[in-house]
Every structure is written in structure tokens, then in C-alpha cells.
From Swiss-Prot:
Short name of one Pfam family: DUF4560
UniProt source species: Homo sapiens (Human)
PANTHER family: SALIVARY GLAND SPECIFIC PROTEIN SAGSIN1, SMALL INTEGRAL MEMBRANE PROTEIN 10
UniProt name for this protein: Small integral membrane protein 10-like protein 3
InterPro entries recorded: SMIM10 (IPR029367)
Amino acid sequence: MAAALSGLAVRLSRSAAARSYGVFCKGLTRTLLIFFDLAWRLRINFPYLYIVASMMLNVRLQVHIEIH
């Protein structure tokens, strides 16, 4: 009887874990798709937005290139 109950508990915990993981993956996938869609829409406008914002805030993107 104890073995049957522990087996049932293990099965229930596995299904709950699988269900919560599935919900997590679905939410993550939806979020990534939203960000990819946003990035695709802003692919032309982003450089202009970046230049205007950096001029307004006086912030520069500093890239350090070291050539040997």
C-alpha cells in the first residue's frame, strides 16, 4: 500500500512539474516571439532612435578595438 501511494505521489509530482515546465516554455516562447517581432519592426528605425537618444542624453557607445 505504501509503495502504491509513493508511486502515485511520484507520478503526480512529475505531471505537475511537466505541466509547469510546459507553461513556462509557452510563456517564454511567446515572450521571445514578441521581442523578435519588435526587433524586426524596428530594424530600420533603431539606428535613428539610438542616434537621437544618444544625442539627447549625451551618451556614446564606446567600442574598444584592440589590433595587435
